[in-house]
Amino acid sequence: MSEKREMLRHFLATLAYRTQKALRGAPDGFAVFRAGNQARTPHELICHMRSVLGYARTYFIGGVYDRSVPDDFALDIERFHDMLSDLSSRLATDSRLDGTTEEKLLQGPFSDAMTHAGQLAMLRRLYGDPVPPENFIVAKISSENLTGDQPAPESPDKIWPEAPKK
């Protein structure tokens, strides 16, 4: 496997980790929270993230990927992680890309999905239940773990000036 593909696999694992960080312990009602002005709900974001990654997968398998429609939130999160695993395995086996490059996958659908992971974290704050900060450099992220079962923070920030007031 090329270094580019190893890096993309790590990026996908980071996406899995950061998405789960934003979702872990979310209160009831968070999945359908709409911040306003037709912004996507967290549930819609997870489906959109799966859709853009499904689009990326078409460069490996051909065809088209239809937009994901929200179903059950927990099931859609599982499907999102399944898509991450599928893409990672294609990168690991040096499956041929047709019509794009590794760089284009990173600048397009992979970065799009990571942007939405950040939006999930922002929506948690707007919902009144912010995600505690951590030092991501020391996070236990593994290219072999694309599941929803991500490790707890290795180095959570001890000082959190913008923590919710109790």
Predicted regions and their residues:
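Short, low-complexity N-terminal intrinsically disordered segments enriched in polar/charged residues
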Residues: 1-2
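Short, contiguous alpha-helical
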Residues: 5, 9-23, 30-68, 99-166
